[in-house]
Curated annotation (Swiss-Prot):
This is Mannose-1-phosphate guanyltransferase. It is an enzyme of class 2 (transferase). Belongs to the transferase hexapeptide repeat family. Its EC number is 2.7.7.13. Pathway: Nucleotide-sugar biosynthesis; GDP-alpha-D-mannose biosynthesis; GDP-alpha-D-mannose from alpha-D-mannose 1-phosphate (GTP route): step 1/1. It is found in: Cytoplasm. Disulfide bonds: none annotated. GO terms for molecular function: GTP binding; mannose-1-phosphate guanylyltransferase (GTP) activity.
Amino acid sequence: MKALILVGGFGTRLRPLTLTLPKPLVEFGNRPMILHQVESLAAAGVTDIVLAVNYRPDVMVSALKKYEEQYNVKIEFSVESEPLGTAGPLKLAEKILGKDDSPFFVLNSDVICDYPFKELAEFHKKHGDEGTIVVTKVDEPSKYGVVVHKPNHPSRIDRFVEKPVEFVGNRINAGIYIMNPSVLNRIELRPTSIEQETFPAICKDGQLHSFDLEGFWMDVGQPKDFLSGTCLYLTSLAKRNSKLLAPNSEPYVYGGNVMVDPSAKIGKNCRIGPNVVIGPNVVVGDGVRLQRCVLLENSKVKDHAWVKSTIVGWNSSVGRWARLENVTVLGDDVTIADEVYVNGGSILPHKSIKQNVDVPAIIM
């Protein structure tokens, strides 16, 4: 089987992290985001993966080469000379996606969930039509494009309603699809939208179905959602009693859902959790309080600091008795001085912060 991952452009929503690494290589749960998807696709029998990119493919080539060998898949880059939206990249990769009659997966690189690729392929094969969209239920459908089914048909899609004022349903597009190669005949090689142009055309012909996603789902393309997605991912691991989580018997674990790389060092009298990820070679000092945060590789949090709702970037340092909260994101190699308070915002790479940041801001 084949798959195309829509990687896209500059990852501006996840800055300042994407100023250092392309978004697919930013670690989520201590592994590059793209690796979660490659691993799940390979487990479902996918042998050819296309990454549709228009930004820094050179950086990704060497990183992804080892995944090819590890998971026995072929990973190719389809490089856009101009952004082609969400449908144009399928046409650009037509030689691979359309090389045989087997269906192919399409997914957005920002989506984290329990990927149901095997079940999705079986469902798609069973109904025999042109396309299937994975949908997920949300509490506030008025913020999204909602999927509406045909009367008396649980899976055949009738239409899409963008940000409905009145309730028409609570299922939204989860950014994961499976398509027959015939869909490529509907797409022109130009900037075009699969959601606004291709899907309505397939719908009109009664050829589009939905598949309900079980479990968690999150688009982690911006910092607040990255943190929310981390909480959902850790909760999912906890339900499965995953060995990736630190046991609750560890003296520093407070509230559970804590992931610590084996190479990290944790000081005395720390309270860590719930929902914390600590990356490779991270150093956490004595008496530190961590909650709902991610500490990326080689970062350091010094004694008695408080870090909550924060992403601490690679090689960054948080000073003694400092306090970070309210969706603060430190880029690569940022230094927060002792006793400094940061109340949200983004701090770009290689900055040193010696004064309080009382109002969320972008510090360049």
